[in-house]
Amino acid sequence: MDAFQSILKFFLNQKTAIGYSFMALLTVGSERLFSLVAFKCPCSIENTAYGLVFLFAPAWVLLILGFFLNNKAWRLFTGCCMNPQKIFPRRRCCRFFYVLGHITLSSLVAPVMWLSVALLNGTFYECAMSGTRSTRLLEMICKGKPKECWEELHKVSCGKSSMAAMDSEEVRLSLQAQSQILGWCLICSASFFSLLTTCYARCRSKVSYLQLSFWKTYAQREKEQLENKLLEYANKLSERNLKCFFENKKPDPFPMPSFAAWEAASELHSFHQDREHYSTLHKVVDDGLEQTPQEEETTMILVGTAQSL
């Protein structure tokens, strides 16, 4: 039993890495499925449009899904049309762009994975580049090749070109090599940028490493317990209402947070060094509805947590 709990604890502690690994495997599988089942290069002047659509359209869909599935995005935008100060509070307008930037970076993970895998495979890029009409690109691709390369480049990816088999294979390998080089450049750039932004966020942290670790643990536990409490109180309230309805009785008072309390607890968290609140809910419970002066607050997002604080 102890061994099972240790294994479970290990997986819970590494769930972020496991999640990214699962996302990478899912991306690789999806790309291979697209390449083998859905992708059929037309071998015509439409090659460029067809290849680029298969290369970038799934990445765009993944980006949109990333925003849809990001809880921080909905926490940021819910009710903003009715009360614009939720996202643009006084003297803290930059906070909105800071949080939006963090949401965007999180949503870009899946699209970058897709583009990287697709470029490393080379199928989509090969089809797209074989349909180019750019003289400059044709000179680069068909350098040292017969004139048929200029006229029938769009047929190379299908093996229907009148060029010699060796020349046609060299062109295909050259296009695939270009695609793989771009793929590795994208992976290296994304990795370096991720490291850079993480280091910058840690360097700008207002709390120490140990306090940050405690903050992450608290945020996760609060999130789990909040979900349980929401379910518990929803069950109690629905049970009370149904019972009173069917028994035709007047309901007893049911303690619930006020509308203002719900609004205050739903705001983005701003860290105050003199008053160490680890979440918006923590702040509301300690201070009620009194607001801390906003110019003394600093918006912070915990890297690697599932909740915006």
UniProtKB/Swiss-Prot annotation:
InterPro entries associated with the record: CALHM
GO-annotated molecular function: monoatomic cation channel activity
GO biological process terms, semicolon-separated: ATP export
Disulfide bonds, paired cysteine numbers: 41-127, 43-158, 142-149
Domain of life of the organism encoding this protein: Eukaryota
Keyword Hydrolase: no
Residues annotated as signal peptide: none
Cellular compartments per GO CC: plasma membrane
Chain ranges on the Extracellular side, renumbered to this chain: 38-45, 130-174
Main location: membrane
Record's keyword terms, sorted: Disulfide bond, Ion channel, Ion transport, Membrane, Transmembrane, Transmembrane helix, Transport
Family: Belongs to the CALHM family.
Oligomer status and interactors: Oligomerizes to form undecameric cone-shaped channels.
Protein name per Swiss-Prot or TrEMBL: Calcium homeostasis modulator protein 5
Originating species: Rattus norvegicus
Lineage: Eukaryota, Metazoa, Chordata, Craniata, Vertebrata
